[in-house]
Every structure is written in C-alpha cells, then in structure tokens.
Amino acid sequence: PGLLPTPVETASALAAGARSGLLASDVVASLTRAGQGFALGALLGSALGFATGYLPRLSAAVTPLVSFLRPIPAIALVPLATAWFGIGETAKRLLIAYAVLLAVWLYVHDGVSRVPVSHLRAARTLG
C-alpha cells in the first residue's frame, strides 16, 4: 500500500493540473515533440525507402543494416540516447524519429521496389 496513488488521488491531481493550466501546456509540449519526431522519421524513412527501393545497389548495402536495427525497440535505446544527447528534447525527438523511420522505410522500400519497370518507362515517356 502507498506505492501508487489511488484512483481518487489521480483524478484530483488531473483536475488540479487542468485548473492550473499545467496539464494543457504539458499536452501541447508532448504533442509538439511527437509531431516533430514523426515528421523527421517519416521524411528520412521516405527518402531512404525511395532511394533503396529504386537503386538495387543501395538497397543491397542498406537493407542488412536496417534489418539489423528493426527488431531493436526504441525503448531499448533510451540509455544510449540519454548518454549521447542528455535528457533534453533532442534525445526524445530522435527516439520517436527512430521508431517511425524504420516502419516508414520498410513500407516505402517495399512499395517502390514492386513498381513494374513498364510503369517507370511509361512515367518517363509521359513526363
């Protein structure tokens, strides 16, 4: 007993945070951080996915590294990110970006690599 707050204590703390405005500012900060990390991860994952999907040599070089990193959850990299970047916003955004990048890369790479060559030729011809 006493290790965790009771539901009543949790609800009263939530209400106090909402009244003081602290809850709203913390939610905005969290959503901003998540959005920035997602945007960075999606941008890098898309660029890498297009490049590796379109260029077989680059795919052969990058795919083993990404396949090695994919099973490592972002939460497992928290100690490493903290050691390298500290406990500030940079480490948090980069961990979110890491989690997003690998998923986006996988789907973009797969989609681009499956485009038939005839469709690429037609697109080049049509401008």
Feature-to-residue mapping (PLM):
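Alpha-helical membrane-protein architecture signal
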Residues: 11, 20, 24, 28, ...
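Short helix-capping/hinge motifs at transmembrane helix termini and TM-loop junctions
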Residues: 1, 52-57, 81, 85-87, ...
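Transmembrane-helix boundary motif in ABC transporter permease subunits
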Residues: 36-66
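Loop-to-transmembrane-helix entry motif
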Residues: 21, 30-38, 65, 69-75, ...
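Transmembrane helix boundary and interhelical junction motifs in multipass membrane proteins
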Residues: 47, 73-78, 89-93
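Alpha-helical transmembrane segments of multipass membrane proteins
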Residues: 46-51, 79-80, 84, 104
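Membrane-cytosol interface at the C-terminal ends of specific transmembrane alpha-helices
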Residues: 88-126
